[in-house]
């Protein structure tokens, strides 16, 4: 058959759509597979990373459909977010139009790959019906006390009068106008993800062996559970007087109470309330005030990369055990949103504290015996050891001292042992237009009130001006002004919108609900119970922390709110590698982008699919290779050229093996080994190593071509098309329909007789070194194996005495000799 990809691919894409071939069934008695690739942002064009991600998921989905599983394999669009607003400013287009136009373009591109998505479950997160239920979840969480409002510091561009995301701050300046960014305190909405910290951490254990260990480690570190001591440093009388009595003490947390006697100063975040009060009162020199203001305007993520700096505050605190006066400093390495925003500094036993103390000539005090460690003049000793200079705790080992010091603090009401987490509550409000409106009303009489469910969804006004200056919703009085749902009085809407990570934290649950129920149900209880969890979730490892953690958290919240019974949303996680060209990630700036549309136009979708699945294992980086693409095309063409040897049949041919030649048996063996490998690949035994499966298919086609028995060729072709269907579906369906009436797209079982060999290769070693090989019939006796082996390696036995003979049946002969 002549290979014409354009005609074949268009034909079968229309067939699958018209026949609803890829839609999930409502029959919950069937075994199910939920295969999901992370949904894309509708940027306008797909890239090769998309192609790889979706071809991996599609191959898995197609395989399990062929195995008679009920498969849910949906697609949707993560459609809210900042790029749409940026495009509106740049191109003078509305974010809504820009977004939906991009969705239309990208869906056409994805369709051209022959991806077997469910068309009837597709949605965009900017669809009002999706926002309706997200707003309902927000209200439920607000009423449950899981969402609260407080002031927080945000990146603020004074020129554009707008909040900037961290990624919009480039070296401390606004990405758009190059104005220096400042930190501005504003009200924000936070979700209490910390209420679930222990469960989020503990249930990672249930994902061992099913998620990549690297992702599990990253989440454990991000949650950051630590046990330690929480206590207060009280200010000295003179310090309290200096600050006008507005502060009496400040809290700290330490995981090293065994070093407490080594505290020589305390460091506070530049944004700490005590520091801000000092600044407000003007109790610091102008130089110090300017230095603090500069520190406060550096985003937290950039502080870790700059030299450590501090400002002496002219205040002192009382050491709770020694009574000594400890100086207070503001330091740029202390973050206000981690712990209490204040730390006890032990320069002798903490590297960061040591570096800061060296810079500002602050004292250090050794309280842990360092043994053979370097001099404390050169570096801090950070390991455990025996306590010294620690009063009544001298001589204790660190672990014992930690317990006793915590107990001492608790017995004397000085502090308490606590479990702390690095994880912070999730700030979900954004001062932007293109996002899900937060469903809260500000009433002068009633305070902050959730909107009535009957008024949901709160939709965005379309008559807005997006110019990059301020929040368009804040400047839209007709939309902003409303009635309080509680008292009916005049009120105003909340103008913040939700972080787009909220949308992607539950979309996988939404897919389980049939489209006809989207208006009336957030989730269909029976359907989500049947489909969840996602059997295979596919996406980049860059989502290991935020998206995957938020999705796990949101699932647990919805469980507690009664929407689902699922504890963990993703049963298995596959993190695919990046697509590289010339050793670097593809990007327009590097000029190394490969356009998927051009690739499909030239070679066809099946070639693109075959290449991305063959060039590297899914979890590894894929290096682009033009000649390998051409090789993939040649293989498909060769597959089509071989149809002259195929007989038309409606079932798997029965082969009489007794009369087969060695070449014919070898061809059958290779084909059935390929079928066996397919079973292993899709069972996750080797992380979906499609590359090895495709290589086996190529070898099998070669073996079939080396023999002339049409029955053998037909059987092999019948099986190979079935194995290749998830990978190159268009040509597989075309050939299968022509010769087998699609009868081979069903579960096939390897023939155990075909897998057997007439002979086995036996390795021969002499004194442990391989010296030769022999061919033996399976099940040959030890005596026969020894005789053949000795003949094969006779030259290595000359002048030697055999002192030991070791035979491993069907595998090995080892001869131990000496002169």
Curated annotation (Swiss-Prot):
Tell me the GO BP annotations in alphabetical order. Answer: leucyl-tRNA aminoacylation
Q: Which UniProt keywords are listed? A: Aminoacyl-tRNA synthetase, ATP-binding, Cytoplasm, Ligase, Nucleotide-binding, Protein biosynthesis
Q: Where is this motif: 'HIGH' region?
A: 40-50
Location of motif 'KMSKS' region in this chain is: 585-589
* A single MF term (Gene Ontology): aminoacyl-tRNA deacylase activity
Locations listed in the record: Cytoplasm
- The main location class comes to cytoplasm
Q: What is catalysed by this protein? A: tRNA(Leu) + L-leucine + ATP = L-leucyl-tRNA(Leu) + AMP + diphosphate
Residues given in the record as ATP binding sites: 588
Its domain of life reads Bacteria
Annotated NCBIfam families: leuS_bact
Tell me its family: Belongs to the class-I aminoacyl-tRNA synthetase family.
Query: What protein am I looking at?
Result: Leucine--tRNA ligase
State the organism of origin: Wolinella succinogenes (strain ATCC 29543 / DSM 1740 / CCUG 13145 / JCM 31913 / LMG 7466 / NCTC 11488 / FDC 602W)
